[in-house]
Amino acid sequence: MEFWRRRKEKGKARECFLKTGSMFLKKLIADCNGISNPIRMFSFDQISKATDDPRCSILDGSSDFTWYKGVIEGKPYSIKIYRMEEMAYNDVVLSARVSNHSGFPKLIGCCLEYPLPVLVFEDLDDYKILNERGSVGCEDAPLLPWNVRLKIAKEVAIAITYLHTAFPRIIIHRNIKAENVFLDKNGKAKLTDFSLAVTLPEGKSWIETKWSGTCGYIDSGYVLTVLVSEYTDVFSFGILMLVLLIGRPGGLLISDGRWNIPSNISECVKDLQERGEPVEPVQMKLFLDLALRCCDRSSGYQPKMIVVAKEIMLIEKVPLDSQMLENVSEDGQITH
């Protein structure tokens, strides 16, 4: 009986490989014009044993996928198993594309012997995942130190800039949010999850497609027009900046189309102080102004991500001196 069961499993795995592998190859060729990073192929048996092992533990999950910790050939890996077809192909193709950049978790390989591709990443067991308040741990945990939050914003901005500028066809992430940011054991921020990402046609700056993303992080203009551009990511990143600054979930920052945030830096500082959080008023004012510019679609002056990343680097260099606040103008520029 065991022989026939194993034979049936292998037959099913072979059938899945032909179907899943064909779709994966089609997506890969369409995305990268024949140029991609080589990744390892894992077998059905390897994934099955790794995820059935008693030592296997679930790292994190959502309604669309589940993360597992598994051991293959004596080495620990993080295994991502999807439930949605298009999302799985998107994630494996684009994760392979950016795998050598330090701003993203490293994709080691995949398995095509399941109905949907199974992604195998480097071991993420030591990684921490930001919660919806931009912190780590339980929801009421203290905020991370301000310099750490600022560093996270900078590193995520650099990763998004890479997506927007490194390839002939711009990659739009479309699901930038706190919960899609991992921190490695050295505190380095890594942006994850390409399940909703789209790649713009070469030479095009936008496409029309069904809107998708996470409530609280989605630009209302994008919902109305269904036009996706790099500014779709800029808006979502602006919300992430506000989450990191204020420590409140993205879904609570906008209510009925209106901002639900402190109207100026003084209110923001007061709010943080009342919650027992340390503050750096000068850097925080510059950071708040930049975040609001990212979210200000109506002005027509939203900055590109490369500009945002550079400005955050400059904010990092501003002296931590609260007495300088009087030298910061209303538009966020430092005066002398």
Can you describe what each PLM-predicted range is?
Residues 164, 168-184:
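Catalytic-loop of the protein kinase fold
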Residues 56-63:
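Protein kinase glycine-rich loop
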Residues 101-104, 168:
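Non-catalytic scaffold residues of the protein kinase domain
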Residues 156-159, 163-166, 294:
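Conserved hydrophobic alpha-helix
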Residues 3-36, 42, 78-83, 89-96, ...:
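Cytosolic eukaryotic protein kinase-like domains
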